[in-house]
Amino acid sequence: MMRTAHKDREPWRDIRRSLLSKWQGVRVCDEPSPWYMSIPTPFSQFHNVLPEEQEEMVFTELKLFLVGNQTENIRIDEYDKHDLPISILANISFDPFIRSELERFHDILVTVATIKICCYAITHDSVTFSSISSAVASTIEKKVNGFITKICTKLSGSTEANQQMNQLLREMHTIHESLNFYNGIVKSIYLDQLIGGQVLSLLDSKRRHVFSGNVVQNLDDVFQAGWKVFARSIGRLVCKFEADHMDYEFVIWSTKQMTDSQCKTLVPSNPSRQIKSSRYVVIESLCPDFFKKYLDILVRCAEFGDSAKSDSSLRRSTSKKINESESVESVMEDVRNVDWSNLDVATTVRMLVQFSRKESACLLREITSATNVDQAIRDIHDLLIKGSCAHDVMLFGLKADILQKPIDEVGNIRMKKLTNDVLGAAAEKHHPFWKYFSFVIDKQNVFEMLGQRTSLGGNADNLRDNVTPMLFECISVKMDCPIEIEPIISMKAVFILTPVFRIWIQLHVASYTIANYRDSIRGQMPSRSLGDIAMKKHLMHALDAEISSIKQKWVGYVDLLINLYYERIQKAASLDEYTECQDILASDVTNMMGISELSQLENIKDILNIIWNYDNADSNLADLIADFEEVQSRARMDVVVA
């Protein structure tokens, strides 16, 4: 059976076909459709057959054609490249009047034949199509058969033999609108090889363009047939934390039958929705368009499944007990007895939202009871927001003679040693959660990175300088969060705050560099260099005061914001609220520090560049002083404008 290749074929289609091929019981449509089997013999010639007898014959054969058969005198004349009928041919021996009457049935016959052929292919090919596709096609086929059976039964009892064809035509025209909609649906599914949520998206869009009451009801019935299968998969995910591992048509697939390469193929490099568990993968294109705003809830349910299992083992290994009425298991009893397949879209969404809130609250209590989350959060704040290890990083970097080396000269072994010397040692004493962090090299300029994140990110090019990056400019941190508390740690907040840590490193190195410069000119008399020494001392003093002012302001901001954070976190009643508090803190920190605004960010960058360029052979002292005065002028202007 010919069918065009799917446009822009998504990689998940080939993987799905490969996974389904492992199941011997999966139906594959490798036989031609039994509907409208061709008749090899040519048309017979009529001799001495009265027009009334021909009309009776045509009426009978029309009914046979409508139920799926080519006949002696009415046949499909031509197929398109997809093996779908496009024209009907009647016996040329018919009376001209009879042939003209048959022409009035042409579109109806082509439509019915197309529906039957497409429905057979869809319902008998579980590899190309899916359970939802099959349920929709089967429902449409039953409805069309019901329409035709009802009409044929009604006309069989008619006493007006002379008007049978006219009556049949009138009856078929009453359902012609429904037939056209059904034809459009099954042809789209058949030609575009739609499965899962793609079918539901198609049906939902069709419903929005129908205004006839009967057609609306019929399309609603078809939609519910497909939605029932999708809702059943939702129930299995929510109640048993099982993703799709049989039909591979649901929006969340199980990875237990997949190879590593298949999993990597299905996970995009920049996914809009990441799922933390390695047991699942999200196929966003299989989510119905009208349901995508609720996809995050489904993803969370899948993640809750892993969290609930890991937290259950944690509870067994700890002496702390959780009230049984507050456990995830008790909350799940509320949804396990629900027949999800009988819920409509609105009820399903309402159930999901309610369950997600309850489950989130339970997991929050369980995680905080089983692990020392407060300590983990404090350690993250100390490392990223307060820059508590920045001074130690500088000292150990100087000791190892790598701090001011180009990044190309610093390998992974030295970075690992720096991690052990600073973070590893601190983890053994005061900051146990630091053991999940490690130092890495990020070659992107931190100010360029922050400039791209601002609302004026288009001007980020202004932040680039043609300087060779040294290690202290590129040191960053990476967190490998333990799975038992992963749901409660906001990776978004960690992402936002990582540049803050990087700037803390540069501020400490700047203070150290200024101190060295001041030591080098201490004791020298101004008269020896015609005033240059005095200007250098003045510049160093001003730069030192500026860096100290920035650090003091940041410390004050951090203390205030962390106190506000702990006030908010005490009111958090769910995982969402808990992680939202972390996101709010991260946003507030960057806003109050001024690094979320391009003008203030540029001021900090320019001050640091003056310090880094001070000792360059091609630097001019007067130019550096002029640059510094310009920075101060811009800063004062920002204050006035604010």
Swiss-Prot record:
Q: Report which gene this protein is encoded by.
A: gip-2
Q: What GO cellular component entries does it have? A: adherens junction; hemidesmosome; microtubule
Q: Which UniProt keywords apply?
A: Cell junction, Microtubule
Q: Which domain of life is it from?
A: Eukaryota
The species this protein belongs to is: Caenorhabditis elegans
What stretches pass through the bilayer? none
Main role? Recruited to hemidesomosomes in early embryonic elongation to direct the nucleation and growth of non-centrosomal microtubules.
Q: Where in the cell is it found?
A: Cell junction, Hemidesmosome; Cell junction, Adherens junction
Q: Which InterPro entries match?
A: GCP_N
The beginning of the lineage is:
Eukaryota, Metazoa, Ecdysozoa, Nematoda, Chromadorea
Give all cystine bridges in this chain.
Answer: none
Which named protein is this? Answer: Gamma-tubulin interacting protein 2
